[in-house]
Amino acid sequence: MAEGAELFFTAPFTSAAKGDKVADAGTAAAAAKAGVAAIVESTAAEAAEKAAHIVGLLPANNLTGPAIFEFEQPTAVLAAGAEPAKAAAAVVDKDSAVELYAGFGKSVYTAFATVGGNAVGVVATGKNLCHNCVAKASRFVRLCDAFSVPVITIVDTEGFVPSATDDIAGGIREAARLAATYADATTAKVAVLAGKAVGPVYTALAAADLRIAVTGCTVSALEPSAAVSVLYKEEIDASDNIIAATNAKAAAYTAEVCSAANAVACGAADLTCDAANVRASVVAALELLSTKRAARLPKKHGNMAL
């Protein structure tokens, strides 16, 4: 969408005349903030050029193999706690990413890119995921699945926003939709457990064909501090300093139970690697899944939460 373009159901001047005046209503900036415009460019010509570039990354249909592009290796190395865009940049080909919906659901990064010259979709998570962030990820994965574009999900998050307000705004519905979207998608899916992948957010985002646990990540059904408060309650209560005892137990629990190696041992991940070898592992995983074709049962569709 061009910066000077307008998009609305109700003309801003009509709405304002009725007392419903909203700043920037109908503008490209408002469309981007609402998650309607995927990209905003300065001019119509630049917007058309960007649209052509994105279409060029996509195959003609879900059965056509992707185009192969020239590429350069990235120079960055994946680090736990990195901003989503930087985490993605460490995995995809250098300068190949085209971010979509940057102004909407900002704790999730979604982009088309290439890995080893092959088109992929990338979802990378930030600290906390609100209902808009989750909706953004769901929609992007559905788009990738429609064209059988492989999806790489980089998971490093505190989880869904712990907020009753966000729940009422649609947090629970969107989380259910996210889990259903990943489960329903038949395209190749690779999950990189780069940092924290705890509780329901792991269940939703790590529904992949191959899950790569990066050394130093935390994979757990429950936040370690909460887990030890239950498992070692009597021992912690008997200590002189409950906070210090809880922290010590949580650190030990994280190292012994929530490690990358233990995630592989218990089936929560398929392989482990260090940060320097994440891209190589992703390239190998995509090569392994390049011939994936999933057969569907002859039925209409599932009952996804919409």
Set out the residue ranges of the language-model regions:
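Ligand-binding clefts of soluble mixed alpha/beta catalytic domains
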Residues: 1-306
